[in-house]
Amino acid sequence: MKADANDASAERGLATIAWLLISFRRGTATVDEYLGGITKQNVALREAPADLASRFNTHIARATMLAEAMLRAKPRDAEAHYQMAVTVGLQASYIATVEGRIIGAFRAARRAYDESEMVLELDPARKYAGLITGVYRYVVSQMSLPLRMMAYVAGFGGGKERGLQMIEDAAAYRSESQADARFALVLLDNREGRYGEAMRQLAELQRVYPRNRLLWLESGGTALRGGRAADAESQLSAGLRMLAADKRQRMFGEEALWYGKRGAARVTLRRLDDAEMDLRRTIAAADARMWVKGRAYTELGKIADLRRDRAAARANFQRAAARQWIETAYSLQR
């Protein structure tokens, strides 16, 4: 910031930190949160902490002002259009994921889409600019029909396969946004059931960011979804050792997630006693989300069923169902 008072990317970085801290405090910084469909115009979410919301809005406003000034000075410069694209793209992401306003994010998202398209028109070699366009193409393809029609009318392009290819091209291109493209592919490959590809991206991210323990949580979850329980158990056990030694702040409900996922892997591996201990720790966690407890009770039901204890199995499955309904009814807790 002191080195260049006109650096939009520095202000954008500060806004990004505030956004990520909000997700961390809510416990929503994992792939699990984004595997469902996009069917609603708005999603009820708990209000963001006022201090962090203020920090985000202050820095994104400054970043936007600086990016606009750069664009006015250099209207045919690809980098100026790129700075505008990523700035308003971040604003759109915040509106959708923190405020829950899907339609409210359309204006900023459309600007980001148009600006990134302009970057590629001015300089097709800048493959990294395709990350924004690719993500929006994919997102539009996953919307319910009414929302998809609204997106088309607003000027968005669709096409899932084209979108994924653009993101893959951005992930393969060495740039400051390469890691962002890899993180995007982790999510989208999980959504598409391409678990091997997601694991490949996660392995590279683990190499680049060896202190980011959540990458081991995501690797374990991805391996579990892909039917690789032994790999999942190994990744999650390694991550839990990192968690125990890490003095940094934990994500809300984080420990419950770790033990719940490892417990599920151990159920699949028929390590039932070890699995039960993990799952009990998940249920006992004071900050465990309802859906996390629901999944833990489901796995305990499986354990009871494998032990031929039908009464315990039924009771645990009923507890799981009850917690899933509670999570739906009280979505403002998320």
Locate the predicted segments by residue:
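Boundary/linker segments of alpha-helical solenoid repeat arrays
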Residues: 8-9, 78-79, 127-129, 176-180, ...
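"A position-specific structural signal for the A-helix of alpha-solenoid helical repeats
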Residues: 13, 20, 83, 90, ...
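TPR/TPR-like (Sel1-like) alpha-helical repeat modules
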Residues: 19, 113, 117, 155-159, ...
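Alpha-helical adaptor scaffolds
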Residues: 177-191, 221-231, 237-290
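Amphipathic alpha-helical segments of tetratricopeptide repeats
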Residues: 2, 114, 121, 171-172, ...
